[in-house]
Design a protein with these regions (language model features):
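Short, acidic/charged, Gly/Pro-enriched secondary-structure junctions
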Residues: 87-134
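Oligomerization/assembly interface segments of phage tail-like spikes and tubes
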Residues: 67-95, 147-163
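Polar/acidic, low-complexity leader/linker segments enriched in S/T/G and N/D
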Residues: 1-60
Length: 303
């Protein structure tokens, strides 16, 4: 629940091994909570954070020798870096040291935590982050034996992805007759394109409409007990089938170079349709489940 009309900022450490099992990382309520709750976690933001708004785009321009001007050939959006200062709190020097150790324990090398942002009117969203190289480097002039508060310690996080993620979302495609399976859903994302994953159940052969200017895409017949997954993300485009024993088969070699391209429109209703073309077994005409589309919303900014 959002505290009044404030923005809640929470850092969640990555999962860690406690010697017997994997446990969730600790949560630190950094801002937007009553002071008593921040004191319980032991860390708060000292000031604001920089790097939360729109990501920085790099324009790549092709210029010719001895020719004025140039051509914009690409726009690249790189990583995101967030920086600020934190206070480490406690009712005694021993408690401050405890919170200090906990904060660092939840920022292990190369392990990604999550920096969450909650507002009353917007979707919850997070950055997948590691601490920056210079995080925590400062001089504390107070006697360590009397240290009951660390103030304005420089801190920062870096994310190798420029956008904020929302909660992963799944929608079943319901049968509407004549072999058509449809889902209509709102995509809250604010980035230009979101690439979903499509899960197709065993029991049939399916056809997808890829949109304007693209041909239809047909799967091969999917055996009962198997599931086919198509990921449309161009960075990791995949088409695999998992059988009833858990074995995976890469199906791209069977597609003769065909690579379906689908993305979801931001901040609007999206309609997604697949069509059942034929049954895998005419003597057992049923599917293992409904088809399903899954995606993770992405946002340009923290609000």
């Amino acid at each position: 629940m959002v505290w009044k009309d404030s923005v809640m900022v929470v850092y969640q450490g990555p999962p860690r091994w406690d010697g017997n099992k994997w446990i969730n990382g600790d949560h630190f309520r950094l801002s937007g909570f009553p002071r008593g709750e921040r004191l319980q976690d032991g860390v708060e933001l000292a000031r604001g954070l920089s790097g939360l708004d729109r990501s920085t785009d790099e324009y790549r321009i092709d210029t010719g020798a001895n020719t004025p001007g140039g051509d914009l050939v690409a726009v690249s959006t790189g990583r995101r870096e967030v920086s600020g200062q934190i206070n480490i709190l406690g009712s005694s020097p021993a408690e401050v040291r405890k919170h200090y150790r906990s904060w660092w324990r939840n920022h292990p090398e190369k392990e990604k935590g999550r920096l969450w942002f909650y507002t009353r009117e917007g979707e919850p969203r997070y950055l997948s982050v590691v601490k920056t190289e210079g995080a925590g480097l400062f001089t504390n002039e107070q006697d360590p034996a009397l240290l009951n508060r660390v103030t304005s310690m420089p801190w920062g996080w870096v994310s190798d992805h420029p956008y904020f993620f929302g909660f992963r979302t799944s929608h079943d495609l319901r049968h509407t007759g004549d072999g058509h399976f449809n889902a209509v859903f709102y995509n809250p994302s604010t980035v230009p394109e979101i690439y979903p994953d499509l899960y197709l159940p065993g029991g049939g052969k399916f056809q997808l409409s890829l949109g304007y200017g693209q041909p239809y895409f047909q799967t091969r017949p999917i055996p009962r007990g198997s599931t086919a997954k198509i990921s449309f993300d161009p960075r990791k485009r995949t088409y695999v089938e998992k059988d009833s024993r858990g074995n995976y088969t890469n199906l791209w070699p069977l597609m003769l170079g065909r690579r379906p391209k689908i993305s979801l429109e931001p901040e609007t209703l999206n309609k997604f349709t697949v069509t059942l073309m034929e049954w895998t077994n005419n003597n057992d005409q049923r599917l293992d489940s409904d088809p399903r589309i899954v995606y993770t919303p992405e946002f340009m900014s923290w609000v």
